[in-house]
């Protein structure tokens, strides 16, 4: 799996001023009181669909929001078997401690999501 990452906020500071400023209203709509991390993930198309591997974003009592930026046949899935197809403008919010995985796409050149960890 090949993935490009652009970090917007991490390590208690803004890493990408321009993008961070564009997202102020988005953070407000999520009711963010404190950011932990925000990053853009771009996963490259593969010939077969597979998961990237189950993981937690952190062990804090925080929330994760995954915002799907484009429509493709990839998914966000959970160990429970529950899954959400990658549809542009779809937002999934869940506890950051919940194990989840992305699934690569095979139908378009890339799967793009924004991953926000916050209180």
Task: Write out the residue ranges for each language-model feature.
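Non-heme Fe(II)/2-oxoglutarate
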Residues: 1-33, 46
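Residue-level preference for beta-strand/loop junctions
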Residues: 32, 61, 108-110
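Long amphipathic N-terminal alpha/beta scaffold segment
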Residues: 33-35, 40
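Short beta-strand segments enriched in hydrophobic/aromatic residues
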Residues: 42-44, 69, 118
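Conserved metal-binding segment of the jelly-roll/cupin
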Residues: 45, 84-101
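A short beta-strand-loop-beta hairpin characteristic of the jelly-roll/cupin
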Residues: 48-53, 60-62, 68-87
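Short beta-strand His + acidic residue motifs that chelate non-heme Fe in jelly-roll/DSBH
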Residues: 53-54, 99-107
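A short hydrophobic beta-strand segment most commonly corresponding to one strand
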Residues: 65-67, 108-119
């Amino acid at each position: 799996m090949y993935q490009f990452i652009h970090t917007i906020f991490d390590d208690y500071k803004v890493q990408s001023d321009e993008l961070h400023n564009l997202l102020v209203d988005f953070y407000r709509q999520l009711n963010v009181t404190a950011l932990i991390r925000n990053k853009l993930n771009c996963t490259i198309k593969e010939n077969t669909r597979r998961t990237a591997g189950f993981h937690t974003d952190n062990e804090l009592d925080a929330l994760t929001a995954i915002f799907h930026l484009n429509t493709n046949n990839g998914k966000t899935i959970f160990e429970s078997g529950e899954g959400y197809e990658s549809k542009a403008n779809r937002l999934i919010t869940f506890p950051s401690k919940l194990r989840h995985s992305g699934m690569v796409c095979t139908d378009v050149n890339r799967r793009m999501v924004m991953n926000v960890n916050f209180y």
